């Protein structure tokens, strides 16, 4: 019952293409962590969820029932593993691949096998390794994970019955309308948590959050940076009423530079 737990190190290493090739070669269910929302799209046949304390149920079901967890460029912070980290993926043999040896020595989750490596080097090597193709048991496991993804949706039908706008319904509607190459930058709080849970990401979309230090005020400056980096391309900024006030002066930057 293997699961790949993808982290932000995949994009940081520049090895996104190799990552997709590896998971499709192995045929292993994939879950994504903070800052790795968009390393795989929702309709991919191997995507099964986003685990963690603010993740979705299908992702947590996959991790907690896995017997092998391949952790790629993911530092497994508290939001990923929970405050009772001793119960995290208890049944799984954990192979943790990270470029930073300090992350592998934290007093929380302990790997069964530590691999200190740059994913830009590790993933191409893994691609060359021969392997036995998955059998019937593995296919049943993948089907079980996909079933949980369909059986436990984040946005429930009753959410749409509210007279006021439900943030989960809003995020689902927004991402359904976005094009496949759109960029979204989210503030801290509801903007990023609901986005992490409910965003239905398409191939090529980017979703940026400040999950590391989680400070308010990140959204507007980051959206400006994302737009400049894409030659003043279109960027959707999701800002809370408190967060946007932290850097409200950046509206002048937008007005000045157009």
Residue spans for each PLM region:
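Conserved catalytic cysteine-centered active-site region
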Residues: 31-45, 200, 232
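Active-site glycine- and acidic-residue-rich loops that bind
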Residues: 8-15, 76-78, 164-167, 243-246
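Thiamine diphosphate
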Residues: 58-60, 65-77, 192-258
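Glycine-rich, acidic loop regions that bind phosphate or pyrophosphate groups
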Residues: 36-144
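Active-site diphosphate/adenylate-binding microenvironment
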Residues: 146-221, 226-227
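Glycine-rich phosphate/diphosphate-binding loops that line cofactor/substrate pockets in enzymes
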Residues: 1-2, 22, 63-65, 173-180, ...
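Glycine-rich phosphate/diphosphate-binding loop of Rossmann-like nucleotide-binding domains
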Residues: 12-17, 21-24
């Amino acid at each position: 019952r293997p699961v790949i737990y993808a982290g932000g190190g995949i994009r940081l290493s520049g090895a996104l293409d190799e990552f997709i090739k590896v998971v499709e070669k192995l045929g292993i269910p994939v879950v994504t962590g903070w800052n790795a929302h968009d390393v795989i799209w929702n309709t991919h046949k191997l995507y099964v969820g986003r685990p963690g304390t603010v993740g979705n149920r299908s992702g947590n079901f996959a991790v907690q029932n896995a017997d092998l967890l391949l952790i790629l460029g993911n530092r497994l912070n508290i939001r990923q593993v929970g405050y009772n980290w001793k119960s995290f993926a208890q049944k799984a043999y954990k192979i943790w691949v990270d470029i930073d040896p300090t992350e592998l020595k934290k007093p929380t989750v302990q790997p069964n096998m530590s691999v200190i490596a740059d994913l830009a080097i590790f993933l191409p090597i893994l691609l060359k390794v021969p392997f036995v193709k998955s059998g019937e048991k593995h296919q049943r496991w993948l089907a079980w994970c996909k079933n949980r993804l369909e059986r436990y949706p984040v946005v429930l039908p009753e959410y749409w019955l509210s007279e006021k706008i439900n943030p989960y319904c809003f995020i689902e509607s927004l991402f359904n309308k976005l094009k496949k190459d759109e960029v979204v930058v989210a503030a801290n709080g509801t903007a990023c948590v609901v986005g992490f849970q409910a965003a239905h990401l398409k191939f090529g979309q980017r979703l940026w959050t400040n999950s590391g230090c989680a400070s308010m005020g990140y959204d507007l400056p980051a959206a400006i940076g994302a737009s400049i980096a894409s030659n003043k391309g279109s960027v959707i900024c999701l800002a809370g009423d408190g967060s946007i006030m932290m850097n409200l002066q950046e509206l002048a930057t937008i007005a000045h530079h157009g």
